[in-house]
A protein has these predicted regions:
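A short beta-loop-alpha structural element at the N-terminal edge
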Residues: 1-15
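Conserved GNAT-fold acetyl-CoA-binding loop/helix
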Residues: 15-41
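A short helix-loop-beta-strand connector motif used in the catalytic cores of GNAT acetyltransferases and
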Residues: 39-51, 68
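Conserved beta-hairpin
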Residues: 48-60
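A short, internal acetyl-CoA/4′-phosphopantetheine-binding micro-motif in the GNAT/acyltransferase core
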Residues: 68-79, 102-103
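Conserved acetyl-CoA-binding loop-helix of GNAT-fold acetyltransferases
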Residues: 80-93, 111, 115
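Conserved GNAT acetyl-CoA-binding A-motif
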Residues: 93-105
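Conserved acetyl-CoA-binding loop of GNAT-fold acetyltransferases
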Residues: 114-123
Length: 141
């Protein structure tokens, strides 16, 4: 089930954010994610976030900022079970177009977004990490 993020969800959602980023981005030092943990928690409280619950446990979430996808995050043990797709489809139902940034070294995420209809528009550089990324977009047809 997908529902709107509630304030009480913050610890579980922030933990999923941290764990997922460390595992998915092994080319970025874990300390980078840990050092941003507190500010991300604060930002999540103000953001448009939808959580996916299974058996009353939050297993994933998606963050939106207008048409920008801040991220799709699924807890490690629940990955590759369609939860990311469900969350992304939920966002697609709410927007006519979406865009996001994804690290070029994150081949798994790039493949996922391509399967879901996103296209690479151009490449750039994440100045905070020094890593190259892609801007990908999706548009309702």
């Amino acid at each position: 089930m997908i529902r709107e993020f509630q304030r009480d969800d913050i610890n579980k959602v922030a933990d999923i954010w941290l764990d997922t980023n460390i595992k998915a981005h092994n080319f970025i030092p874990a300390e980078y994610w840990k050092s941003n943990f507190k500010s991300v928690k604060e930002a999540l409280l103000l953001a448009e976030v939808y959580v996916y619950e299974y058996d009353t446990e939050i297993q994933g979430f998606i963050g939106l900022n207008d048409e920008y996808v801040e991220g799709v995050f699924v807890s490690g043990e629940m990955q590759s079970q369609g939860i990311g797709k469900i969350l992304l489809n939920y966002a697609k139902d709410k927007r006519n177009k979406l865009h996001l940034n994804v690290y070029q070294k994150n081949a798994r995420a790039i493949s996922f977004y391509k399967r879901e209809g996103f296209e690479i528009q151009h490449s750039g550089l994440d100045e905070a990490t020094g890593e190259k990324d892609y801007v990908m977009t999706w548009q309702h047809k």
